[in-house]
């Protein structure tokens, strides 16, 4: 079983889409191994997105991610990283396939409803950024 990180971003939290998005993940076969709501500080958002620090959109991304609470989850399932990215859809909601989370709930390339890890390596780093081992309930093996 793989694990991946998913974040329901401030736009979706603010519009009360948490339950709908969680239901999509569960109906897609994911098990939620951990979940919590947090309101990121500037330092926390900058740390999480440090890989993008030199990109022109960095400050806008940080400002958006601190604009309201987010829901952070560890999703568990077979081929979790790839499946989560398929369920989320393209970064730009206008290019996302019909039925994906971003097509349903995203507004723009910057305000796009959810974040998901892009590799197993990054998933491990991102999960450790938000959760301690005691907070993650692994499936019985």
From Swiss-Prot:
It catalyses: a 2'-deoxyribonucleoside 5'-diphosphate + ATP = a 2'-deoxyribonucleoside 5'-triphosphate + ADP; a ribonucleoside 5'-diphosphate + ATP = a ribonucleoside 5'-triphosphate + ADP. Belongs to the NDK family. One of its GO terms (molecular function) is ATP binding. Homotetramer. Its cofactor is Mg(2+). ATP binds at residues 9, 57, 85, 91, 102, 112. Major role in the synthesis of nucleoside triphosphates other than ATP. The ATP gamma phosphate is transferred to the NDP beta phosphate via a ping-pong mechanism, using a phosphorylated active-site intermediate. CDD domains: NDPk_I (cd04413). InterPro entries: NDK-like_dom, NDK-like_dom_sf, Nucleoside_diP_kinase, Nucleoside_diP_kinase_AS. This is Nucleoside diphosphate kinase. One of its GO terms (cellular component) is cytoplasm.
